[in-house]
């Protein structure tokens, strides 16, 4: 009764389940109906045979005919069960059941008319057809019930399947007795009654809803899924179920259409498939079908009369029904695994009793009754466990994608075993006689052991949590995991900070694993930690000073100093951050790169070191001891397993320090800081004395290490690896010192210095930095002002407003948060040994990084093998996964799994990164200034092509469209998931589609005129030569001419690279003069010198839970864990075109791109990456040069003659202020509507107006980065099915401008020149006038009141937390509107960050150069047209 009153068990849910289980009742009825009339059917066959052939049939032949009648039912079941998966996907769960009833009616009619037709062949055919019907039922019904049942009732409702089977068995046995239909005249009616369940289901089932999971995940019909859930739950609040389904879809989207062969070959899905198969075999080979089919004859052979045997058979059916009812509440209370073990154990015992009763029945008369009791006990335990659990657990072990195929295979195996038992039991009974049940006893013992060892508990687990276990082990050996899937509660208080580590189980101890951390802070929710975070303080390492992860290479016995860290790099001391790998052998490298684990021990993070078999000890080091060791230079050594735990303030997070390990697996993408480092102001529990000691040590270290810096190497992303060597003018080259010596010379960086760099990238960061850090940073970075003025790299972290606040190149330390894009220009150019460089999350190792000696290709292949083993956790990984011509690197590609609730609970979130590859053809290409090619094409690499090719938005359809509309001469590439990683012969699991990985390829060109533009004399050239890749053969370089040294200025709040768009144009101008400092002609020469592959990897960090819980827009919440990674060519452009931008440019610092949630991605993106065309206006960097306008004009001319195509339109008409609307096909607002079957029904693309430059020498062409965007709003409602959203007002997110700008003419079209067009490379509009360029704005979200191009507060604990309000000071400080300034107006108007919003607007309106004309484009009217047309599309979708 408690189950009947359980929450969630509504009337309509009960009705739907009853209607569905009629199919299982059909299965039970036809299983037992052939048993009772056995003698009658045999007599009928004898009569037919005698009438045909005129002779009597032998007893052996009649037994064979009857066996065929019994077993052909199982043959049909095999066929139907195997077709169940296809039927479920093709017609749906409900649709398949309805169609299946046609077979049931046909089969029942054939059996019913068998005697009338005087043909036992019709009986065989009818049994076969009804077998197909029952096989489909056994596949579709459990699937349907498991998908409509709520989580808390799924086990009990799954048992209803077996209840219906037992009821069908009992009904067939009762009707088959001689007093009812068990006669010569009644048995055809008995068989024909199978038509009743089919007709009843045809009447009842149409009222029931389709499976919501099928509607939402498979068909992408969200509104229908919501309606079905509302009916089933009798409630309008179904968001929890919807979120669980979305989580399942996100976690398993790469397997959404997995075939049967893919299921069998998949290493991740093979273990649950084996479990499902064995569970089905445990049901059939337990011997239960022998009891069902031959119970009457079995009891008669035991000594019972025929009448008594029939009543005993009825008793078996009745006990089955009763025990199945009893097992329903036990299923969710005791658990599936436990009940199955009880059932198998009891059946084993009673099968022994049955065998004993057969042996001694002739000696003891009452032993015949013992056989009856033993048989009844056998049936009782079958009903408790193996009767219902195999059907249920098979559906639970698989997610939505592989579930149909898995159920088909399981049902096929079940029916095959059913057939074997049915056809073989008579012969086995004749051969074994009294030992008939002994083979079943052996099977029961085997199945019990397998269940105990291998089968997990699935009670109260979501489908994602169940599958997490198998993904966790990557399809290899499973341990006894009874409780491994239990939810792990994560306390929200910082005093109970815990780290979740998901380890890869490897086949030998030389393999590496992947880790993922999350820190749960009270009031903040899950907060992923970067792998570069040390929870234990500055002096403690994750494995102790000798562990590779904590202090890589500091232990004795290793030949090399620098080791690339794999796994958890909680804090990488100084020596560990050097990539000097030429003396370390592969074994040592792999041996010391093992896992680490961090567990929660009474609120203290306890760190368990790498597993070493011969050393099982655990050492715990106190915080202060670790700090002292840190200050002493980190010379302590430690071997074996070590740990460090540290008490800290209960309300403060432990101090963290970023690491520069070039090969980290992190919870954030490259150049991102996923953990907010605590500043000095936030550490009251830290003694001030420690700070001064650290500062003093750092100063000593800084001056001490100036001449030793060249000995160390930082491995960069790719062939952009730059040696960390001192300036040649300051130190002569030296030979590398011994590893231990190097480590002693280079103590780890102090805590506060790391903190300063962590906060030095954004204006928001600076307000968290203590004065001590500022002073020290100023003192530390006043050495290389010259390189900064030359623009020799984008160096975030500088304080440009003061002479003492310029940054030296070695101290670069960029930090970005999740979903930001990586700044290519700052890729690991840190020369300072104390610098934490950037947080590089790629895994990349070089043996001779910047070494002069060449390295053969075989060693690189070996390293590729190591990386492949680490990435996929298998020693069988071929090295071809990583090509020998490139560095072999990957990110954490462990699949995302877990529903949204489990992600919140377990924080089991994996991360990925943004990766960059460059194949340099010249030495100069290594320079940051040469990383801004003009890209001519972008193509999609389909690593996650889950949508069928026939659907709109699939990779095939988009690719075909791109080929048809691509300009002549453009490049389009498409690679398969295996070919993308270098081989088409790899096993499926080696380079299989990853659910967190989309990749884009971009073929680019670098302007030749940029060569030498950033020179600095012979010293600079010598430094560049030292940075040349050791594996590259230098090519003859063009003549290098010195260029003008540009000094830029900006606000005191600006922290970032000194190079700007204006400076870049000046350098180009000086280059155009061939070395002269005056302006000259600008040469628009483009030479194909570099090819760049840009790989964007989806990052799945803490922001999913945080942004959704803090009412941020749905798009970012949805796409954050959505495996269809939404990155357009616009984002790639932003990624690649910001090398010369300053740090306060929000696009380059911390913008979280609002990725477009659609697969309808454009490929062609023609020539949008202007050299050095970054956002100078954003930083108020107003430097002029007479060559600036020439440079911009040259680029405009180059772009004007280039062929540009919008793939979403057929017209190539250039955009102008007159056609920015939705009235024609040639517009720059792409609203892409696909069919209703498409997952993402529509999208709103970026709007970006290209404007030229004019104004002559009076006003330089200040090219704005991302200028000219029309404002748009990402809606907060469900974006995947617009017809399901009834509460929105502006459906496509096109919103008004702020009131101050709505009436401004020219505001929309008047953006300054931008480096990008529309994401699909729309043709450039005509250049606008000088007045039109004076004002442009960034994309402003009026609904959420923050700038979409700003840093979205993805985590409340980050320095960038809090929504940016355009009306407040924060918005003006970071996101004030920019406009071009003529020289005479610079003093009149200054973009100081202290301006308020109203003051800034007022000042803009009163700008002397601002003027309104009637013939200019009126943005307000355009927006009205946009919204009007958008609403029409939405209304159309609603009606559809």
Swiss-Prot record:
<feature type="region of interest" description="Disordered">
    <location>
        <begin position="966"/>
        <end position="987"/>
    </location>
</feature>
<dbReference type="GO" id="GO:0016020">
    <property type="term" value="C:membrane"/>
</dbReference>
<feature type="transmembrane region" description="Helical; Name=7">
    <location>
        <begin position="311"/>
        <end position="331"/>
    </location>
</feature>
<feature type="transmembrane region" description="Helical; Name=10">
    <location>
        <begin position="406"/>
        <end position="426"/>
    </location>
</feature>
<feature type="topological domain" description="Cytoplasmic">
    <location>
        <begin position="24"/>
        <end position="67"/>
    </location>
</feature>
<feature type="topological domain" description="Extracellular">
    <location>
        <begin position="451"/>
        <end position="534"/>
    </location>
</feature>
<feature type="topological domain" description="Extracellular">
    <location>
        <begin position="149"/>
        <end position="162"/>
    </location>
</feature>
<dbReference type="InterPro" id="IPR005829">
    <property type="entry name" value="Sugar_transporter_CS"/>
</dbReference>
<feature type="topological domain" description="Cytoplasmic">
    <location>
        <begin position="361"/>
        <end position="372"/>
    </location>
</feature>
<feature type="signal peptide">
    <location>
        <begin position="1"/>
        <end position="23"/>
    </location>
</feature>
<protein>
    <recommendedName>
        <fullName>Glucose transporter type 1</fullName>
    </recommendedName>
</protein>
<keyword id="KW-0732">Signal</keyword>
<feature type="transmembrane region" description="Helical; Name=3">
    <location>
        <begin position="128"/>
        <end position="148"/>
    </location>
</feature>
<feature type="compositionally biased region" description="Low complexity">
    <location>
        <begin position="1313"/>
        <end position="1330"/>
    </location>
</feature>
<feature type="transmembrane region" description="Helical; Name=5">
    <location>
        <begin position="187"/>
        <end position="207"/>
    </location>
</feature>
<feature type="binding site">
    <location>
        <position position="391"/>
    </location>
    <ligand>
        <name>D-glucose</name>
    </ligand>
</feature>
<feature type="region of interest" description="Disordered">
    <location>
        <begin position="1304"/>
        <end position="1330"/>
    </location>
</feature>
<dbReference type="InterPro" id="IPR036259">
    <property type="entry name" value="MFS_trans_sf"/>
</dbReference>
<dbReference type="GO" id="GO:0042593">
    <property type="term" value="P:glucose homeostasis"/>
</dbReference>
<feature type="region of interest" description="Disordered">
    <location>
        <begin position="1000"/>
        <end position="1083"/>
    </location>
</feature>
<feature type="region of interest" description="Disordered">
    <location>
        <begin position="725"/>
        <end position="808"/>
    </location>
</feature>
<feature type="topological domain" description="Cytoplasmic">
    <location>
        <begin position="427"/>
        <end position="429"/>
    </location>
</feature>
<keyword id="KW-0813">Transport</keyword>
<feature type="topological domain" description="Cytoplasmic">
    <location>
        <begin position="184"/>
        <end position="186"/>
    </location>
</feature>
<dbReference type="Pfam" id="PF00083">
    <property type="entry name" value="Sugar_tr"/>
</dbReference>
<feature type="topological domain" description="Extracellular">
    <location>
        <begin position="394"/>
        <end position="405"/>
    </location>
</feature>
<feature type="region of interest" description="Disordered">
    <location>
        <begin position="1380"/>
        <end position="1401"/>
    </location>
</feature>
<dbReference type="InterPro" id="IPR003663">
    <property type="entry name" value="Sugar/inositol_transpt"/>
</dbReference>
<feature type="transmembrane region" description="Helical; Name=12">
    <location>
        <begin position="535"/>
        <end position="555"/>
    </location>
</feature>
<keyword id="KW-0472">Membrane</keyword>
<keyword id="KW-0812">Transmembrane</keyword>
<dbReference type="GO" id="GO:0015749">
    <property type="term" value="P:monosaccharide transmembrane transport"/>
</dbReference>
<feature type="compositionally biased region" description="Polar residues">
    <location>
        <begin position="669"/>
        <end position="678"/>
    </location>
</feature>
<feature type="compositionally biased region" description="Basic residues">
    <location>
        <begin position="754"/>
        <end position="789"/>
    </location>
</feature>
<feature type="topological domain" description="Cytoplasmic">
    <location>
        <begin position="117"/>
        <end position="127"/>
    </location>
</feature>
<feature type="transmembrane region" description="Helical; Name=11">
    <location>
        <begin position="430"/>
        <end position="450"/>
    </location>
</feature>
<feature type="topological domain" description="Extracellular">
    <location>
        <begin position="208"/>
        <end position="272"/>
    </location>
</feature>
<feature type="topological domain" description="Cytoplasmic">
    <location>
        <begin position="556"/>
        <end position="1440"/>
    </location>
</feature>
<feature type="region of interest" description="Disordered">
    <location>
        <begin position="628"/>
        <end position="708"/>
    </location>
</feature>
<feature type="topological domain" description="Extracellular">
    <location>
        <begin position="89"/>
        <end position="95"/>
    </location>
</feature>
<dbReference type="InterPro" id="IPR045263">
    <property type="entry name" value="GLUT"/>
</dbReference>
<feature type="transmembrane region" description="Helical; Name=2">
    <location>
        <begin position="96"/>
        <end position="116"/>
    </location>
</feature>
């Amino acid at each position: 009764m408690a189950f009947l009153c359980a929450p969630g068990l509504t009337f309509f849910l009960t009705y739907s389940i009853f209607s569905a289980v009629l199919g299982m009742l059909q299965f039970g009825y036809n299983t037992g109906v052939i048993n009772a009339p056995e003698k009658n059917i045999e007599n009928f066959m004898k009569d037919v045979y005698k009438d045909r052939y005129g002779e009597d049939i032998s007893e052996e032949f009649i037994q064979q005919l009857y066996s065929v009648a019994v077993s052909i039912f199982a043959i049909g079941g095999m066929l139907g069960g195997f077709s169940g998966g296809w039927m479920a996907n093709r017609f749906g769960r409900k649709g398949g059941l309805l169609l299946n009833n046609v077979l049931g009616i046909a089969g029942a009619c054939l059996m019913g008319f068998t005697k009338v037709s005087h043909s036992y062949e019709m009986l065989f055919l009818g049994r076969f057809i009804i077998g197909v019907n029952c096989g489909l039922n056994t596949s579709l019904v459990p699937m349907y019930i498991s998908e409509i049942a709520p989580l808390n009732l799924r086990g009990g409702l799954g048992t209803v399947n077996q209840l219906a089977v037992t009821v069908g068995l009992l009904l067939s046995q009762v009707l088959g007795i001689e007093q009812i239909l068990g006669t010569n005249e009644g048995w055809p009616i008995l068989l024909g009654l199978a038509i009743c369940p089919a007709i009843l289901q045809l009447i009842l089932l149409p009222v029931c809803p389709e499976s919501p999971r099928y509607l939402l995940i498979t068909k992408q019909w969200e509104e229908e899924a919501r309606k079905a859930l509302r009916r089933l739950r009798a409630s309008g609040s179904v968001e929890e179920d919807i979120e669980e389904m979305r989580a399942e879809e996100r976690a398993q989207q790469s397997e959404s259409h997995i075939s049967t062969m893919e299921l069998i070959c998949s290493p991740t899905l093979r273990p649950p498939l084996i479990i499902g198969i064995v569970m089905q075999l445990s049901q059939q080979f337990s011997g239960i079908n022998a009891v069902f089919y031959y119970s009457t004859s079995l009891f008669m052979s035991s000594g019972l009369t025929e009448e008594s045997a029939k009543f005993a058979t009825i008793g078996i059916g009745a006990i089955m029904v009763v025990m199945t009812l009893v097992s329903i509440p036990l299923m969710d209370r005791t658990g599936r695994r436990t009940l199955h073990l009880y059932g198998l154990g009891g059946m084993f015992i009673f099968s022994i009793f049955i065998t004993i009763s057969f042996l001694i029945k002739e000696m003891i008369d009452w032993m015949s009754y013992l056989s009856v009791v033993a048989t009844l006990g056998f049936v009782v335990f079958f009903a408790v466990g193996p009767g219902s659990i195999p059907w249920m657990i098979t559906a639970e072990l698989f997610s939505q994608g592989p579930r149909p195929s898995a159920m088909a295979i399981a049902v096929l195996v079940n029916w095959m075993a059913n057939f074997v038992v049915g056809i073989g039991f008579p012969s086995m009974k004749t051969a074994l006689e009294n030992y008939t049940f002994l083979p079943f006893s052996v099977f029961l013992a085997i199945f019990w052991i397998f269940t105990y060892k291998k089968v997990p508990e699935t009670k109260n687990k979501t489908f994602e949590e169940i599958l997490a276990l198998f993904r966790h082990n990557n399809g290899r050996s499973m341990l006894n995991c009874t409780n491994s899937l239990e939810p792990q509660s994560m306390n929200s208080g910082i005093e109970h900070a815990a780290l979740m580590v998901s380890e890869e189980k490897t086949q030998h101890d030389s393999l590496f694993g992947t880790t993922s951390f999350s820190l749960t802070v009270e009031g903040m929710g899950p907060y992923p930690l970067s792998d570069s975070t040390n929870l234990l303080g500055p002096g403690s390492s994750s494995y102790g000073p000798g562990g590779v992860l904590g202090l890589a290479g500091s232990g004795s016995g290793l030949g090399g100093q620098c080791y690339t860290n794999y796994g958890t790099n909680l804090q990488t001391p100084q020596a560990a951050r050097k990539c000097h790998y030429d003396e370390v052998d592969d074994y040592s490298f792999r041996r010391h790169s093992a896992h680490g684990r961090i567990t929660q021990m009474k609120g203290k993070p306890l760190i368990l070191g790498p597993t070493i078999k011969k050393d099982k000890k655990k050492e715990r080091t106190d915080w202060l001891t670790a700090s002292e060791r840190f200050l002493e230079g980190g010379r302590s050594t430690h071997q074996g397993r070590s740990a460090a735990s540290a008490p800290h303030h209960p309300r403060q997070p432990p101090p963290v320090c970023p690491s520069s390990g070039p090969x980290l697996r992190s919870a954030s993408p490259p150049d991102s800081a996923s953990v907010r480092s605590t500043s000095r102001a936030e550490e009251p529990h830290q003694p001030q004395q420690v700070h001064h000691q650290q500062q003093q040590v750092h100063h000593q270290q800084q001056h001490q290490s100036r001449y030793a810096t060249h000995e160390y190497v930082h491995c960069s992303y790719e062939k952009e690896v730059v040696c960390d060597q001192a300036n040649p003018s300051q130190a002569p080259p030296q030979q590398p010192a011994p590893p231990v010596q190097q480590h002693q010379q280079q103590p780890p960086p102090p805590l506060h210095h790391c903190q300063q760099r962590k906060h030095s990238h954004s204006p928001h960061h600076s307000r968290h930095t203590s004065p001590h850090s500022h002073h020290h940073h100023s003192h530390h970075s006043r050495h290389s002002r010259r390189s900064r003025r030359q623009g020799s790299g984008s160096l975030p972290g500088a304080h440009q407003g003061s002479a003492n606040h310029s940054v030296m190149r070695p101290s670069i330390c960029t930090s970005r948060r999740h979903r930001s894009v990586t700044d290519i220009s700052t890729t690991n150019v840190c020369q300072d040994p104390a610098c934490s460089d950037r947080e590089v999350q790629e895994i990349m190792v070089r043996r001779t990084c910047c070494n002069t000696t060449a390295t053969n290709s075989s060693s690189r292949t070996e390293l590729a093998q190591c990386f492949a083993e680490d990435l996929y956790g298998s020693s069988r990984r071929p090295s071809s996964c990583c090509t020998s011509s490139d560095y072999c690197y990957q990110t954490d590609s462990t699949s995302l799994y877990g529903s949204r609730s489990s992600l919140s609970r377990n924080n089991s979130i994996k991360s990925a990164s943004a990766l960059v590859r460059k194949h340099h053809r010249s030495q100069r290409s290594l320079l940051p200034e040469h990383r801004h090619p003009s890209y001519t094409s972008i193509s999609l690499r389909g690593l996650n092509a889950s949508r069928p090719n026939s659907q709109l938005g699939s990779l095939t359809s988009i690719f075909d469209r791109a080929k048809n509309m691509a300009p002549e001469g453009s490049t389009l590439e498409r690679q398969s998931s295996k070919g993308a990683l270098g081989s088409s012969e790899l096993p499926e699991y080696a380079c299989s589609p990853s659910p967190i990985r989309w990749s884009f390829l971009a073929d680019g060109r670098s302007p030749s005129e940029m060569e030498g533009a950033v020179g600095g004399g012979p010293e600079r050239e010598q430094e560049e030569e030292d940075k040349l890749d050791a594996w590259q053969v230098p090519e003859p370089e063009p003549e290098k001419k010195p260029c003008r040294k540009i000094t830029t200025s900006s606000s005191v709040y600006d922290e970032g690279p000194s190079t700007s768009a204006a400076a870049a144009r000046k350098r180009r101008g000086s280059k155009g003069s061939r070395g002269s400092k005056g302006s000259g002609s600008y040469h628009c020469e483009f030479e194909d010198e570099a090819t760049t592959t840009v790989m964007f990897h989806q990052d799945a960090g803490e922001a999913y839970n945080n942004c959704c819980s803090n009412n941020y827009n749905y798009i970012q919440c949805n796409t954050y864990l959505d495996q269809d990674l939404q990155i357009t060519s616009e984002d790639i452009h932003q990624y690649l075109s910001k090398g010369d931008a300053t740090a306060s440019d929000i696009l380059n610092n911390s913008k979280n791109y609002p990725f477009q949630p659609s697969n309808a991605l454009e490929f062609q993106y023609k020539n949008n990456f202007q050299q050095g065309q970054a956002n100078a206006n954003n930083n108020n960097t107003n430097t002029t040069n007479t060559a600036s306008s020439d440079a911009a004009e040259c680029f405009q001319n180059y772009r004007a003659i280039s062929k540009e195509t919008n793939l979403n339109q057929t017209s190539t008409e250039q955009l102008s202020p007159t056609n920015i609307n939705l009235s024609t096909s040639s517009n720059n607002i792409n609203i892409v509507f696909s069919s209703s079957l498409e997952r993402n029904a529509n999208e709103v693309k970026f709007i970006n107006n290209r404007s030229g430059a004019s104004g002559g020498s009076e006003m330089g062409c200040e090219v704005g980065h991302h200028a000219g965007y029309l404002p748009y709003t990402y809606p907060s409602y469900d974006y995947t099915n617009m017809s399901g959203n009834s509460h929105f007002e502006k459906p496509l997110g096109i919103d008004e401008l702020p009131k101050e700008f709505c009436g401004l003419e020219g505001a929309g079209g008047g953006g300054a020149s931008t480096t990008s067009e529309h994401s699909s490379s729309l043709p450039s509009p005509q250049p606008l006038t000088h007045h039109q360029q004076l004002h442009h704005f960034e994309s402003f979200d009026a609904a959420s009141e923050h700038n979409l191009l700003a840093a979205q507060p993805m985590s409340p604990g980050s320095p960038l937390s809090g929504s940016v309000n355009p009306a407040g000071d924060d918005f003006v400080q970071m996101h004030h509107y920019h406009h071009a300034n003529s020289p005479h107006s610079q003093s009149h108007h200054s973009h100081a960050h202290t301006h308020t919003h109203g003051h800034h607007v007022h000042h803009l309106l009163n700008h002397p150069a601002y003027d309104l004309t009637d013939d200019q484009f009126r943005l307000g009217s355009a927006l009205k047209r946009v919204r009007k047309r958008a609403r029409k599309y939405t209304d159309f979708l609603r009606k559809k």
